């Protein structure tokens, strides 16, 4: 039982046998919790259970939770690779009791696991308790038989946990392992406690109080247990290692990196190998959980992790993208425990490869500037924070990379001046991370939800019904009536109107009675499941308890049904064409169009789009029945049902099934497309009519969007395209079938004419004293200081042709300097200067072109002594720029 996978399984199975429900790890992106950047502890997914918002059928749970600490308050990034126990990604083993067992059984379960199941020697263990927790002190003596000397009272907050300023809190008890007196360090609470001899392996939190205000606590009616054990730490102990990076999992990754780079795992490059191994885990799991590299929020943290690993790859000599070639090794080690890695393997590889390819030039440029700016510094010096910020802000070179690169030379960064520069920039830029919450204006809906309960939805089976008015709202206030002309909202006791949800727009229609008519223009869901009908009273007065006939707009609902069903078919078709990593990131289902956003790292080719469209339309043509069923959420997932990423589902879910699952398309047994969905759908796939994909684009880094039409809109779009093609064919005097060949011939003819025109312009430009020269007021060849100078402003010449013209001029002169300026349509000037070989020792083309660039309003210029180019925004000063070159030659 020494391997990481065996240790994890043993923990879960032990608590499973002791009545705990084995719960899967929640995603690294916390669900419905804007206060957290990433999941950083096992208790995060149970937060609402501990606070009483949610109830669980089983009051005991156990999990191995994926965690990331690389942003915000919990940030281990800078230390990773240089210490034995810092990680950006780690696994937290934990058992939880929600008002069930408490301290005595928690201590008993923990002690039996580590001493009997894991077999740790009792004399190598000691524990800490909160100084005021006499109960825990006594239980450790009674259950574990520990002497007083091995139960250490800690008076500080290290042994008292609280969720926030208010809420559940309680004392902690930590279990430590003694690595032996050959390692420096003392027990917790001693002056030498920061040494590495005694290492915490498990923290037991006894939630027994409710903090109502600072310093004021009341006992909880049902105390709870929350524990956390770092898998990497306990694995190191059980494998006889004092360093987490020496455990089997990390060693397998480090060997894979060493095999690709030739680095020595025990040599000077050990830290870089460890950084890459750790960051590979964090990057891969974040991508698998839907985070993609970007310039803000979670995506920026991921980008920093990836780029830090890439910089260490360069230190190991990697000159091509490295990390993507290591994903297979991670999947081999952790894919069985975390199948999301297997599903997203292709996406992870492609995202890493693209990001490293994009970053390579930035990395090389940034390191070059860093070397240039720090080459005079010595060990103990401080690197200028303003320059560090310029590297970050202008060149995309993160601060931690600057610090990391300078660390080996013993040089630190002036963080204060970096922070000042960052603060100045933030004052001009929008905040990249904000929380979310309901505004005060929304409180009326929560009050109505509390009073009325959930609205009963009838709309899956019907578009008409009768109902009573349960509440009326106008201008954000509850009212007794709505009169003719009033705009407001109506809440009913039941409704067939679908409320906007899951990307599907809400229904419209009419609510009516004798002498009363209310036009519904929008249906929304408020306070969770309160259906709100927004619109205007067209006739009469509507009061509370008024009985109304409800009629959904049938044609509009039908179009929405078709578009929603089409998104499901397109989702499955995309998965089959592009890979299993395809996951929905958002959608819009409207009556006249649909769009579908999904994770994919690169644009989709025209051929791939055609295949997606064809596959989806095959299912439409087969006219299979669309079925829905209610299932337990775990049963639905086991059957292959696809869920919206990050969505939290109840115990029972609605599953929408389309097509037959028996065809050879890799579909599961339930059907061809199987998704958890609460929307409205067609009865048969043939009711969709036709799916026409109209566009594909990027929404954000790593997120693509396709747009499509169905049914009548698709047919109208196709007819319009055919009419346009016929009109174009008529203009070209050919048939629609022959139009591609006709267009190709015209394009070839145009290119030929453009080439001939360009050649004519170049000849005219170099004609010497001709129309072009006269028109621009340019000089002919003249002698300046004994040197021939050809200085001309040329007209109608592409900037890309200037160099070849300068070469021609050098041949014409034999000996001399050639300067040509071309002005673009937007008024910018571009200049190329050439110097013949016999004069290079006297004149540098780079120096001369920079003189001209200054006049044109540009900065610098570059090239070689015999040929250089530059530019500037003020092309109208072409003659002055040429005069500046002449003056420089004259000396």
From Swiss-Prot:
One of its GO terms (molecular function) is tRNA binding. Signal peptide: none annotated. One of its GO terms (biological process) is alanyl-tRNA aminoacylation. InterPro entries: aa-tRNA-synth_II/BPL/LPL, Ala-tRNA-lgiase_IIc, Ala-tRNA-ligase_IIc_anticod-bd, Ala-tRNA-synth_IIc_core, Ala-tRNA-synth_IIc_N, Ala-tRNA_ligase, Ala_tRNA_ligase_euk/bac, DHHA1_dom. It is an enzyme of class 6 (ligase). The keyword Cytoplasm applies. GO terms for cellular component: cytosol. It is found in: Cytoplasm. Its EC number is 6.1.1.7. Binds 1 zinc ion per subunit. Belongs to the class-II aminoacyl-tRNA synthetase family. Catalyzes the attachment of alanine to tRNA(Ala) in a two-step reaction: alanine is first activated by ATP to form Ala-AMP and then transferred to the acceptor end of tRNA(Ala). Also edits incorrectly charged Ser-tRNA(Ala) and Gly-tRNA(Ala) via its editing domain. Consists of three domains; the N-terminal catalytic domain, the editing domain and the C-terminal C-Ala domain. The editing domain removes incorrectly charged amino acids, while the C-Ala domain, along with tRNA(Ala), serves as a bridge to cooperatively bring together the editing and aminoacylation centers thus stimulating deacylation of misacylated tRNAs. This is Alanine--tRNA ligase. It comes from Rhodopseudomonas palustris (strain BisA53).
């Amino acid at each position: 039982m020494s391997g990481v996978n065996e240790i994890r399984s043993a923990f879960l199975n032990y608590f499973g046998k002791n009545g705990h429900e084995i719960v899967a790890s929640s995603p690294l992106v916390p669900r419905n919790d804007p206060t957290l950047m990433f999941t950083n502890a096992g208790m995060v997914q149970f937060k609402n259970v501990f606070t009483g918002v949610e109830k669980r059928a089983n009051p005991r749970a156990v999990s191995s939770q994926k965690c990331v600490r690389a942003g915000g308050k919990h940030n281990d990034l800078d230390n990773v690779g240089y210490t034995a126990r810092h990680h950006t990604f780690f696994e937290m083993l934990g058992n939880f009791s929600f008002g069930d067992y408490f301290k005595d059984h928690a201590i008993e379960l923990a002690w039996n696991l580590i001493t009997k199941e894991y077999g740790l020697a009792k004399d190598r263990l000691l524990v800490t308790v909160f100084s005021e927790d006499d109960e825990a002190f006594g239980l450790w003596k009674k259950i574990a038989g520990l002497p007083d000397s091995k139960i250490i009272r800690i008076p500080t907050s290290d042994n008292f946990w609280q969720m926030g300023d208010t809420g559940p809190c309680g004392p902690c008890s930590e279990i430590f392992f003694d690595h032996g007196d050959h390692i420096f360090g003392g027990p917790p609470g001693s002056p030498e406690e920061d040494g590495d001899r005694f290492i915490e392996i498990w923290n037991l939190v006894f939630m027994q109080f409710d903090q109502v205000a600072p310093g004021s606590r009341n006992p909880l009616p049902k105390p709870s247990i929350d524990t956390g054990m770092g898998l990497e730490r306990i694995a190191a102990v059980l494998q006889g290692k004092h360093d987490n990076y020496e455990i089997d999992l990390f060693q397998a990754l480090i060997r894979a990196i060493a095999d690709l780079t030739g680095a020595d795992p025990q040599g000077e490059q050990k830290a870089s190998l460890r950084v890459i191994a750790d960051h590979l885990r964090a990057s891969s799991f974040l991508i698998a959980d839907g985070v993609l590299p970007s310039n803000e929020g979670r995506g920026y943290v991921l980008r920093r992790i990836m780029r830090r690993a890439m910089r260490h790859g360069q230190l190991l000599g990697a000159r091509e993208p490295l990390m993507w070639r290591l994903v297979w090794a991670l999947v081999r080690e952790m894919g069985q425990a975390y199948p999301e890695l297997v599903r997203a393997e292709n996406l992870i590889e492609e995202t890493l490869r693209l990001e490293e390819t994009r970053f390579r030039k930035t990395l090389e440029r940034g390191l070059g500037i860093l070397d240039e700016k720090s080459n005079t510094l010595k060990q103990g010096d401080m690197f200028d924070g303003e320059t560090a910020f310029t590297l970050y802000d202008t060149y995309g070179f993160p601060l931690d990379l600057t610090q990391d690169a300078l660390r080996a030379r013993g040089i630190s960064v002036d963080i204060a001046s970096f922070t000042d520069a960052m603060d100045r920039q933030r004052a001009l830029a929008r905040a990249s991370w904000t929380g979310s919450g309901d505004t005060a204006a929304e409180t009326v809906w929560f009050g109505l939800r509390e009073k009325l309960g959930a609205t009963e939805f009838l709309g899956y089976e019907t578009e008409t019904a009768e109902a009573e008015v349960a509440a009326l709202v106008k201008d954000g206030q509850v009212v007794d009536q709505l009169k003719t002309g009033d705009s407001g909202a109506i809440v009913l006791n039941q409704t067939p109107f679908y409320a906007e949800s899951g990307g599907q727009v809400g229904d419209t229609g009419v609510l009516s009675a004798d002498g009363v008519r209310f036009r519904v223009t929008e249906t929304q869901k408020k306070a969770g499941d309160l259906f709100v009908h927004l619109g205007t009273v067209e006739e009469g007065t509507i009061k509370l308890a008024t009985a109304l006939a409800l009629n959904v707009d049938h044609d509009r609902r039908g179009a929405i049904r078709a578009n929603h069903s089409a998104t499901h078919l397109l989702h499955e078709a995309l998965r089959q064409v592009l890979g299993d990593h395809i996951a929905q990131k958002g959608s819009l289902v409207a009556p006249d169009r649909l769009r579908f956003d999904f994770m994919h790292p690169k644009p989709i080719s025209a051929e791939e789009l055609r295949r997606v469209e064809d596959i989806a339309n095959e299912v439409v043509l087969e006219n299979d029945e669309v079925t829905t069923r209610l299932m337990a959420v775990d049963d639905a997932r086991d059957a292959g049902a696809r869920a919206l990423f990050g969505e939290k589902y109840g115990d029972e879910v609605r599953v929408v099934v389309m097509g037959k699952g028996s065809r050879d398309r890799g579909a599961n047994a339930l059907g061809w497309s199987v998704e958890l969905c609460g929307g409205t759908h067609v009865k048969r796939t043939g009711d969709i009519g036709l799916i026409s994909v109209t566009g594909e684009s990027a929404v954000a880094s790593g997120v693509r969007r396709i747009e499509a039409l169905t049914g009548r809109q698709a047919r109208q779009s196709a007819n319009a395209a055919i009419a346009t093609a016929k009109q174009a064919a008529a203009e070209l005097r050919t048939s629609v079938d022959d139009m591609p060949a006709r267009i190709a011939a015209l394009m070839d003819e145009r290119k030929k004419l453009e080439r001939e025109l360009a050649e004519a312009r170049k000849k005219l430009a170099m004609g010497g004293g001709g129309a072009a020269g006269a028109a621009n007021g340019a000089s002919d060849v003249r002698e300046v200081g004994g040197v021939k100078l050809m200085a001309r402003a040329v007209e109608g010449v592409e900037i890309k042709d200037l160099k070849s013209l300068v070469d021609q001029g050098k041949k014409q002169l034999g000996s001399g300097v050639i300067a040509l300026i071309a002005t673009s349509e937007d008024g910018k000037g571009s200049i190329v200067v050439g110097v013949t070989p016999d004069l290079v020792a006297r004149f540098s083309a780079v120096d001369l072109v920079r003189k001209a660039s200054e006049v044109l309003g540009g900065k610098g210029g570059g090239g070689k002594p015999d040929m250089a180019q530059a530019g500037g925004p003020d092309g109208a000063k072409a003659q002055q720029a040429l005069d500046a070159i002449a003056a420089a030659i004259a000396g």
